[in-house]
Amino acid sequence: EMLARIQNDLFDLGADLCRPDDIDGALRIVSAQVERLEQEIDAMNLKLAPLDSFVLPGGSAASATLHVARTVVRRAERLSVALASESDVNPLVIQYLNRLSDHLFQLARINNDGGAGDVLWTPGATR
């Protein structure tokens, strides 16, 4: 259900980018979509141990796939920021992509046994 809703949101987002002059706003990302992601991030965060290290992409196959999806969303966010410097972009598009990448990060951690199976970064000086 959650992923199906996000997929629908991404179609809204794509339409928003294609039609920045959409007057009636039917094909726009709206603040409620960003807020929903934030609420889900907060709920997932309550189930996870706090981090004291960076998390490397990996762990379970599902988690690794979610990490890859997160990097793709980050790239889309950077491209949207660049586009916004040249033309009109709904600021909620950029906010949504930012929150979605955090959402995918939390999902990746949950898919690694609630964060217990996270692959943590070991700094070079301590390897």
Where are these regions (language model features)?
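Phosphate/pyrophosphate-binding loop motifs in nucleotide- or prenyl diphosphate-using proteins
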Residues: 1-127
